[in-house]
From Swiss-Prot:
Belongs to the RnpA family. Signal peptide: none annotated. This is Ribonuclease P protein component. It catalyses: Endonucleolytic cleavage of RNA, removing 5'-extranucleotides from tRNA precursor. RNaseP catalyzes the removal of the 5'-leader sequence from pre-tRNA to produce the mature 5'-terminus. It can also cleave other RNA substrates such as 4.5S RNA. The protein component plays an auxiliary but essential role in vivo by binding to the 5'-leader sequence and broadening the substrate specificity of the ribozyme. One of its GO terms (cellular component) is ribonuclease P complex. It comes from the Bacteria. It is an enzyme of class 3 (hydrolase). Its EC number is 3.1.26.5. Keywords: Endonuclease, Hydrolase, Nuclease, RNA-binding, tRNA processing. GO terms for molecular function: 3'-tRNA processing endoribonuclease activity; ribonuclease P activity; tRNA binding. The lineage of its organism: Bacteria, Bacillati, Actinomycetota, Actinomycetes, Mycobacteriales. InterPro entries: Ribosomal_Su5_D2-typ_SF, Ribsml_uS5_D2-typ_fold_subgr, RNase_P.
Length: 133
């Protein structure tokens, strides 16, 4: 189970992460990653609340994934993966990171191991700092 302190709650938070964050995709998921410490200048902006209790996650599982049973099963798998990443992999995410995981159509047929591999790959790719040549 994903604790409440690790959940994105409002549509404004989802929108902020998806617009301002970096993204990386795979066959099953698209990972949007945003570090809230990058844009907060000491004043709290509406909808952009810094959370230092740990990384925060949000899930988007659309009807493209499958029927309600498949979507809920996929959501449960993704929540479990997010909880294990938040607890056991502090090197991947800092407490100021916000993550939105968007499940693609292939996520409904994927195993938990494939989903975890794709999420870790997406987090690693999205967290790399780009350098201009």
């Amino acid at each position: 189970m994903l604790p409440a302190q690790h959940k994105l709650n409002s549509s404004m938070q989802f929108r902020t992460v998806m617009r301002k964050g970096r993204r990386a995709g795979s066959k099953t998921v698209v990972v949007h990653l945003w570090d809230s410490a990058e844009s907060l200048d000491g004043t709290e902006k509406q909808g952009e609340v810094a959370s230092f209790g740990g990384p925060r996650f949000g899930l988007v599982v659309s009807k493209a994934v499958g029927n309600a049973v498949v979507r809920h099963r996929t959501s449960r798998r993704l929540r479990h993966i997010c909880a294990s990443i938040a607890e056991k992999s502090p090197e991947l995410l800092s407490p100021t990171h916000h993550v939105v995981i968007r499940a693609l159509a292939g996520a409904g047929n994927a195993t938990s191991a494939e989903l975890e591999r794709d999420i870790r790959y997406g987090l690693g790719k999205a967290s790399r700092v780009r350098t201009n040549k």
